[in-house]
Design a protein with these regions (language model features):
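Cytochrome P450 core scaffold surrounding the K-helix E-X-X-R motif
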Residues: 440-443, 449-452
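CBM-like, beta-strand-rich accessory domains located in the C-terminal region of large
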Residues: 6, 347-348, 352, 450-660
């Protein structure tokens, strides 16, 4: 059966590529308009162009590129093929490459490979997710062809790549279809294509199927695309950063082109400008997404590396370096001891190994920073931070913690300003991590792109306020614009207090108390004239086997290892406790059901209503006995907290004035 499969593949390739020579574009003088013929090393090319021997000139130009070693690509260089030659590739990579031969493409890992047809239909949209189509036009899915080609030397893979590049160029000219600026000619997408194509150029340059005619077609298309990005930068956000970085890639990958220096300088100018706009004073990128924050660090550092390769590092000022260093330190503040972080703002779950690799790159850039070294060495060298609880006040990221190792208790909290596209209406949301367990993971995003103006119910649910650990009115989404009231990160009674204008005529004041560096009390106040059903939501880890006790309004996890959590409402007024539907998504297009619960009470008048919750981690299979006495001075509606809290016989006096 496998033999028949490969016979079919090669028959398919012969059919697809039978007209490849007929596609060869006639080479003339204008073919060289994009080349700086005075560039060092192109003397023979210039002489042949001057002599009007254009075919010979293109052959000489190809010879130049095949022998070029002074231009370095961050991903794949001409000389790298020696590392791949004869090296066994993974079964998955080989399968992907062979599928590409059949025009079965897998642009995004969240979806299977789809058949785009013998006559490739670049407009085929098999699912209602615009991300899949934009990833198709980034063309990163071609990489397995290059890897397998450089491993095996089998020209079938190179021939198919040349064919598909030509097919893409022919069928995706600007204006070829009405919404091309949302897909193939979206500047953000084009910029990624430039980046990938510069690597593929090196992967396939030595193939006999990479002809002089194809070289000129490739370079002319590359020039058109780079000029397009430079003239169509996205106005704001991480897209603009990626576009600028990829313009630097373009300029450094093909310095022989007339516009190369303009492209490179354009990228540097944008990055120098945008780092001041997009990075808040506390070091967090302004879209407030932990994953995208790390992505922007890579953008800024890749730009520095490209500048170093081109001898123009000084075009990035010291302030640029300092901000990137601050960005790296911010990652440690919003992370847990296992190097993961909350999935705020369309983030997806990372791994410790991935983050250690990041830190090992970062510590080489900032070798004098002992805190970055500490993270990079997994605590074996360097210096751990001098603080425990910490804040990133401009982003509204706060962390209570009692240590830096995996036996620690850490609560990460989001209470920030309005943010960009990736931000979700989730102020007040928190993630509680105790002894290497994330008890209340953020929901994640599952999917974060719609198709045009079409709604996506999954995207809407994952973005919704009720999917997060915070307060809602009638389960509607809130607006984010938190204002800090008080932050006290030291001592045995630590406090975070903020006010958020969640709804029209309803402000949400949330107060987090970290008691004895052991447990938490959350005090919510709904202030304003709005009426409706108030609720506070608790979404727990999918394997927690959580259960409820309606008699004392408590939720308990049931882990067999004894590392458990009880959440109990301490209100004396009538509150209902119910289970609700919830999910968590750690990877794109993958989700898991999880236990979730909601405490509800009506707000029928203008009086302030409140909730008082305790989150108590414990180390056995029996939850602690928690009792509360409201003392005479206790008046939640007026911001006066005076409670006597008894936990397994230990008495805690909790007194706090919540008024500014």
């Amino acid at each position: 059966m496998k033999t028949n499969k490969y016979l079919f593949i090669f028959a398919f390739i012969l059919f697809s590529a039978q007209n490849i020579l007929a596609q060869e574009t006639k080479i003339n003088k204008t073919s060289f308009d994009l080349i700086n013929l005075d560039y060092k090393g192109l003397e023979k090319v210039k002489a042949l162009v001057t002599a009007k021997k254009y075919e010979d000139a293109s052959e000489q130009l190809l010879k130049y590129y095949r022998g070029r070693t002074d231009v370095k690509n961050l991903d794949f260089n001409n000389t790298d093929r020696q590392k791949y030659a004869g090296k066994k590739v993974s079964d998955n990579t080989l399968e992907l490459a062979n599928d590409i031969l059949l025009h079965k493409f897998k642009p995004h890992k969240g979806y299977p490979a789809y058949d785009y047809g013998k006559d490739i239909n670049w407009q085929y949209r098999p699912v209602q997710d615009q991300l899949l189509t934009t990833f198709l036009h980034r063309t990163a899915f071609w990489e397995p062809l290059g890897i397998v080609y450089n491993s095996t030397g089998n020209e079938t893979y190179a021939k198919e790549w040349v064919f598909e590049v030509r097919d893409w160029i022919q069928k995706n000219k600007q204006g070829a279809y009405p919404d091309d600026k949302q897909y193939a000619w979206k500047a953000f997408v084009v910029s990624f294509r430039l980046n990938h194509w510069s690597s593929y150029f090196n992967m396939f340059i030595n193939s006999p199927h990479f002809t002089p005619a194809f070289l000129m077609e490739f370079l002319n298309s590359y020039k058109e695309q780079a000029d397009y990005v430079m003239n169509n930068y996205t106005d704001i956000g991480n897209h603009r950063l990626y576009e600028a970085l990829h313009m630097m890639y373009a300029g450094s990958s093909f310095p022989e082109m007339n516009h190369a220096e303009t492209w490179r300088k354009s990228g540097i100018t944008v990055l120098n400008d945008e780092i001041k706009k997009q990075v808040l004073p506390d070091g967090v990128q302004f879209e407030l997404s932990p994953s995208y924050h790390i992505g922007t660090i890579k953008i800024f550092l890749d730009a520095l590396q490209i500048a170093q390769l081109n001898g123009v590092e000084k075009e990035f000022p010291e302030s640029y370096h300092n901000l990137v260093e601050k960005m790296i330190l911010a990652v440690g503040k919003y992370s847990f001891p296992d190097y993961t972080f909350p999935l705020y703002g369309n983030s997806f779950l990372t791994t410790k190994s991935a983050m250690l690799k990041n830190y090992q790159v970062w510590t080489k850039v900032f070798p004098q920073n002992k805190t970055i070294e500490y993270y990079a060495a997994d605590g074996k060298s360097g210096l751990k931070p001098e603080y425990l609880s910490s804040s990133l006040p401009n982003a509204g990221f706060y962390a209570f913690r009692n240590g830096w190792d995996t036996t620690s208790t850490v609560m990460q909290i989001k209470a920030g300003p309005p943010a960009g596209f990736h931000s979700q209406p989730d102020n007040g949301n928190f993630v509680l991590w105790v002894k290497d367990r994330d008890f209340t993971p953020d929901a994640g995003s599952f999917v974060y792109a719609n198709v045009g103006n079409q709604e996506n119910s999954k995207r809407d649910w994952y973005r919704s306020t009720k999917a997060h650990q915070t307060l809602t009115l009638d389960d509607q989404n809130i607006q984010n614009d938190a204002k800090l009231i008080k932050w006290q990160p030291d001592g045995n009674l630590q406090l975070l207090s903020y006010l958020n204008p969640s709804y029209k005529n309803l402000n949400h004041e949330r107060n987090f108390l970290f008691v004895d560096k052991t447990f938490f009390i959350i005090i919510d106040r709904a202030i304003g004239t709005a009426k409706g059903d108030l609720a506070i939501h608790y979404n727990l880890k999918e394997d927690s086997k959580a259960s409820i006790n309606s008699l004392n309004n408590s939720i308990v996890t049931n882990y067999s290892d004894g590392n458990n959590l009880v959440i109990q409402l301490l209100n004396k007024d009538k509150v209902t406790l119910k289970e609700e539907s919830s999910f968590v998504s750690y990877q794109y297009q993958k989700e898991t059901n999880r236990p979730a619960f909601v405490f509800k009470k009506p707000k029928n008048n203008e009086l302030t209503q409140g909730f008082i919750s305790i989150l108590y981690p414990y180390n056995c299979n029996k939850p602690p006995e928690i009792k509360i006495i409201e003392n005479k001075g206790h008046d939640l509606s007026n911001g006066k907290i005076d409670l006597t809290l008894t936990i397994n016989g230990k008495i805690n006096q909790i007194q706090q004035n919540l008024n500014p």
